[in-house]
């Protein structure tokens, strides 16, 4: 039944607070309606002035990191499924064919646009720290932080997985097919086998070389099929996972809660409790997990409205911070081949990361100055720090309106993860980023899937060197800060594009450069995705194979410090609507994905 909701006319479609609305200078009027809730932790929703469904001529599209996952989504769309139905299918297959990046043992963030009503809502399936978690659980006996390789393999790194419950919540509201239907492609593929891809083969080999697989996962991923296996399954070999099929069949038959009780839950708890460094995750923690349906964070950028995730993801805030800083410069006149264009993008990233590192965490438990961080006047003051000819020598966090005193946290997130976009025949859109965090997560393989190591996204230290409390410190029931940035963009009340990426901390930079490429530099989605990946959080990590060496040398002359990179794990996927109502898709050439349309 369609929800009846009231209307409220404001300057932009949504704001966290009145100060954010007042600060938005984009010359675009929007219509906002508060969206009512239907269970779960609902905060609100943006509502875009919806275009009538009859104006939608684009068919549908799936853009994801693996062809098998794309085909699963297309199968569900052809069967009359919604964007959310297809998202369930895509995620289920990604957990099988790309287990190093995401899966049902991890978490996700999903941004959804309902073309019929104009609702823009987000779903938070982030992992939660168990009740036994402590602020010092990633410190050794001397009080020093554990090294990341030690922490990531520990049971302490495993958070309560959220992706299955989140998909269940989204499906209850936006699913069109029975819950059991979207799981079928993954179940079939797990039972029959799928061909090992070059990327999966390479990453199994890399993990084996670093001795980074625990026995059960090693047995599954190696030719020998033993706990001491040493040979990755070769490219093209058929890999079956009947245990995963049984797990998915249970979820498909009994609903999302089947994952959080009974045999699956017991396997998860046993996996987290195993050595090395057993964790405290319990059956009670799993039973208590609830996803959240939250308002997006949205702001104007030139003639566009950009919407993303709110905390515990820092992605939405940081992407809007980058764009809000760049809005004070004529980026379109600079272009993607200019020194000035990259210089301003670097500086805006540096400013956004400094604020993000200091202030953003799980805002259920920590005060986060959401409105202040994206306030137009504040970002104008940050933009004033940018010189047209010299890189800033030092970048410190600013003092946005409402900011508390915090210690800086430079926690690094490993570039794992996966992102996909689905658009269905009615124009509904899903932009979803999903992860087990590091490659193969915590390396604990249970019930046919890998458990996450998401709790290593917390700061390992509860206070900084000055004794200031760190916002992203560990606490029981808390969600670790994320950089995941599933994003939707609108123009004149109509859906314009969806984009997102994996990449750890660098996700923010990848998404921002792609948005600038399309919105400022006039590039197609594929051209924008293909732009060099650059991450300016400390020394600028630049994808040297894709950027003009002369531009790099000129930027060095301005004071920028560089470190060579190879893309650093991006997997950008985007879909855009053209002026005549057709879909343009993009898949990151750095991975194995594709974007395919349904006529």
Q: Each predicted region: which residue ranges?
A:
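Short beta-strand scaffold segments in enzyme catalytic cores
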Residues: 102, 107-114, 418-422, 486-488, ...
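Bacterial N-terminal signal peptides that target proteins for export
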Residues: 1-12
């Amino acid at each position: 039944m369609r929800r009846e909701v009231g209307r409220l006319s404001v300057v932009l479609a949504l704001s966290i607070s009145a100060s954010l609305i007042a600060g938005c200078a984009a010359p675009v009027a929007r219509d906002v309606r508060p969206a009512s809730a239907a269970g779960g932790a609902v905060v609100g929703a943006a509502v875009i002035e919806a275009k009538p469904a009859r104006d939608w001529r684009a068919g549908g599209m799936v853009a994801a990191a693996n062809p098998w996952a794309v085909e699963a989504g297309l199968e569900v769309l052809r069967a009359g499924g919604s964007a959310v139905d297809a998202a369930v299918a895509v995620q289920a297959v990604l957990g099988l064919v790309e287990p190093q990046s995401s899966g049902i043992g991890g978490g996700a963030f999903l941004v959804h646009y309902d073309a019929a009503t104009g609702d823009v809502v987000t779903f938070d399936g982030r992992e939660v720290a168990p009740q036994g978690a402590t602020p010092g659980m990633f410190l050794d006996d001397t009080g020093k932080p554990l090294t990341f390789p030690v922490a990531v393999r520990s049971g302490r790194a495993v958070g309560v997985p959220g992706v299955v419950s989140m998909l269940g919540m989204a499906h209850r509201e936006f699913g069109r097919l029975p819950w059991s239907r979207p799981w079928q492609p993954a179940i079939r593929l797990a039972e029959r086998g799928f061909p090992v891809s070059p990327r999966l083969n390479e990453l199994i080999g890399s993990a084996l070389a670093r001795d980074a697989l625990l026995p059960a996962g090693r047995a599954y991923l190696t030719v020998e099929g033993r706990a001491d296996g040493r040979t990755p399954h070769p490219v093209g070999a058929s890999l079956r996972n009947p245990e995963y099929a049984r797990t998915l069949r249970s979820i498909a038959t009994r609903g999302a809660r089947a994952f959080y009780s009974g045999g699956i839950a017991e396997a998860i708890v046993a996996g987290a409790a195993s050595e090395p460094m057993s964790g405290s995750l319990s059956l009670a923690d799993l039973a208590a997990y609830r996803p959240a349906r939250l308002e997006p964070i949205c702001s104007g950028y030139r003639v566009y409205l950009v919407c993303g995730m709110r905390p515990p993801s820092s992605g939405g805030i940081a992407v809007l911070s980058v764009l809000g800083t760049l809005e004070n410069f004529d980026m379109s006149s600079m272009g993607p081949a200019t020194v000035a264009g990259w210089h301003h993008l670097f500086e805006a990233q540096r400013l956004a990361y400094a604020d993000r590192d200091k202030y953003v965490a799980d805002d259920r438990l920590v005060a986060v100055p959401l409105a202040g961080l994206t306030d137009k006047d504040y970002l104008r003051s940050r933009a004033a720090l940018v010189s047209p000819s010299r890189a800033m020598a030092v970048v410190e966090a600013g003092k946005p309106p409402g900011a508390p005193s915090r210690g800086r946290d430079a926690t690094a997130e490993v570039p794992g993860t996966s992102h996909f976009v689905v658009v269905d025949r009615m124009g509904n859109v899903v932009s979803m980023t999903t992860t087990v965090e590091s490659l193969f997560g915590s390396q604990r393989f249970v019930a046919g899937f890998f458990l996450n190591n998401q709790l290593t996204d917390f700061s390992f230290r509860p206070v900084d060197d000055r004794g200031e409390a760190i916002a992203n410190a560990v606490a029981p029931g808390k969600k670790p800060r994320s950089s995941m940035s599933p994003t939707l963009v609108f123009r004149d009340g109509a859906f314009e594009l969806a984009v997102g990426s994996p990449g750890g901390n660098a996700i923010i930079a990848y998404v921002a450069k792609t948005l600038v490429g399309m919105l400022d530099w006039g590039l197609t989605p594929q051209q924008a995705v293909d732009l060099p990946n650059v991450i300016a959080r400390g020394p600028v990590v630049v994808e040297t194979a894709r950027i003009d060496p002369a531009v790099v040398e000129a930027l060095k002359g301005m004071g920028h410090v560089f470190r060579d990179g190879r893309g650093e794990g991006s997997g950008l996927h985007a879909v855009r609507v053209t002026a005549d109502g057709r879909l343009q898709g993009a898949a990151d050439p750095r991975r194995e994905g594709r974007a395919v349309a349904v006529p």
